[in-house]
Amino acid sequence: MKGTVFALGLLCVSATLTSCFKDEPLNAECDIEQAYIHVDNPEAMFFNNNDTLVKVLSSERNIKFKVLPEADITAVVPQFRVTPGATVAAVDGLPLNTPRDFSDGKTVQYTVTSEDGQWNRTYTVSMGMRTLDAISNFGFENVQMVTEGCNRPYDAWVESFDDGYIIDCWATGNGGFDISMGVEDDENHVTKDQFPSVSVDNGRTGKAVRLTTCDTGPFGHLMNMPIAAGNLFLGKFDLSEALGETLKATMFGVPVSKKPLNLSGYYKYKPGETFTNRDNKIDPTITDRGDIYAVLYRNTNEKGQAVTLDGGNVRTSNLIVATAIIDEVKTTDEWTFFNIPFTYTANIDPTTLARHGYNLAVVFTSSFKGADFQGAVGSTLYIDDVNLSWEE
């Protein structure tokens, strides 16, 4: 009975995380679900037509449109699809149909207010595009704390340029683990350092990433998700799918405009003692192991529709054109070098590449079957000093 009550309580908590939900007669949701721009000639402004629309995840507060470097963005009118009954207004008080100047990194803030008037969220809209291929070395020194829309704070990683420009390119499943562990004052309370994906100071150089397979507590067991592997990947994590179609929650890949040639870096790894399957049954025939791999894929299908690979197809999609997969993550207490060349299975269209028509996913995980909620609690993978080499 206690477990059932706990699970029902957590379901309520998860709803609040995704959309400001509250049991009121009028709708209490206050989200921007989509942002879009209508222009007569999208090819002159965007890399491809799909870039005219941005899907906004429930955890996001920054909305960035990907535009060509030469695009005129001095008089643009963003438009929004919001949750039913909600209203949106510019923070500066100007009408929504006012053309805005987004040149030179300028931003505009908009506030969404729920139908019941009790809740609001502020979003920042910007335009521009700097791709990941402008960076080669990833030391994971830039750590931010997620504090909004969660039960407890947890780590997240970003990359920054010399001028301070930030690329929010790395994602983890920490948000899903946060849901499974309930609110801060319950019996399953965990601290930031007990999350699956954590920043640590004892890196090979400076900080490192520690990925640990963790027990998800009574709620996770009830949902047939008994473990959460520590993971770090290029892409986004969709909290709205964390308790539903879980494989779709991991949205793998970010746009690139150069061909990746090699993925290298350093790791340490130790498997947990006991491997359990999704039913939380011990499987003595399997020793857990970590995984490191990268996938380059076309981000539009044959119909021209935008595609993002997820946990269900990131290794199998026919849109994949290159992979870099480690042969083995060995058990070791020492920082161990890995160097994985990309193997190309299809020709790269240089025009498509230049217009950001390919996405790159790089994935690190403490349990090789973590996407299916199988693994050994305590399996730990440390990652540091990762390098991506690009074709110039």
Regions found by a protein language model. Name each.
Residues 111, 139, 262-268, 293-295, ...:
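Residues within well-ordered beta-strands of beta-sheet-rich folds
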Residues 129-186:
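Extracellular carbohydrate-recognition regions
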Residues 301-354, 376:
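Extracellular carbohydrate recognition and processing domains
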